[in-house]
């Protein structure tokens, strides 16, 4: 496929399905990471305000899980496709780093990243994956004169996905739009599929379900 697409502008959107193949649990699964918590209790700005300790423990568990999972063949295949394609952008709805560990370089995380934490005062993000960053205590930033508490650098329900201007521009200009591990029927993925189709891109849906 890399040879066929080598002179095309290719954009790939990945969803939870591609990470599930590596053992990353998703809230859609019966045994998923979210099953003991309502989404409203752990993944909204309101939850952070009402019970920071619960939200922090929840995301620390997810951050620690990153140490236990590895990229799968799909991650490596996308990195190989990128290396053979002149213009390639990978947009992921996932918050893990499996694409990067699989070799992908041009990655946009629209829902944030588990590896980074965000200063509540400045909004700046820092990679914080040291042993002391993964325990039960809150983590303080390095960017303020008086260190501030950091929050998960995640787009919670009700918040706007990151880098949407860049994402929409890339999708508008692409020749081929590939959706992997997502149904493509739920927003914002559905909106990106519609955007690609309206600009005459060739759309390919690869869903693991």
Task: Label the predicted regions.
Residues 1-209:
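Conserved catalytic core of sirtuin-type NAD+-dependent deacylases
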């Amino acid at each position: 496929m890399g040879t066929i697409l080598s002179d095309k502008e290719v954009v790939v959107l990945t969803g939870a399905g591609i990470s599930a193949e590596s053992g990353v649990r998703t809230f859609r699964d019966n045994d998923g990471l979210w099953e003991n918590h309502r989404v409203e209790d752990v993944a909204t700005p309101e939850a952070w305000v009402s019970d920071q300790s619960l939200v922090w423990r929840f995301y620390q568990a997810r951050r620690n899980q990153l140490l236990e999972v590895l990229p799968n063949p799909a991650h490596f295949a996308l990195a190989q496709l990128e290396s053979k394609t002149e213009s390639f952008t990978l947009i992921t709805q996932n918050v893990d780093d499996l694409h990067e560990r699989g070799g992908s370089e041009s990655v946009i995380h629209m829902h944030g990243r588990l590896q980074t934490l965000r200063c509540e005062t400045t909004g700046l993000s820092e990679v914080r994956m040291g042993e002391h960053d993964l325990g039960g205590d809150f983590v303080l930033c390095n960017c303020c004169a008086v260190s501030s508490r950091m929050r998960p650098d995640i787009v919670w329900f009700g918040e706007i996905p990151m880098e949407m201007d860049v994402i929409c521009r890339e999708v508008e200009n692409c020749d081929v739009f590939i959706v992997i591990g997502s149904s493509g029927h739920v927003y914002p993925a559905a909106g990106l599929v519609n955007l690609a189709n309206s600009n005459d891109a060739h759309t390919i849906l690869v869903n693991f379900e």
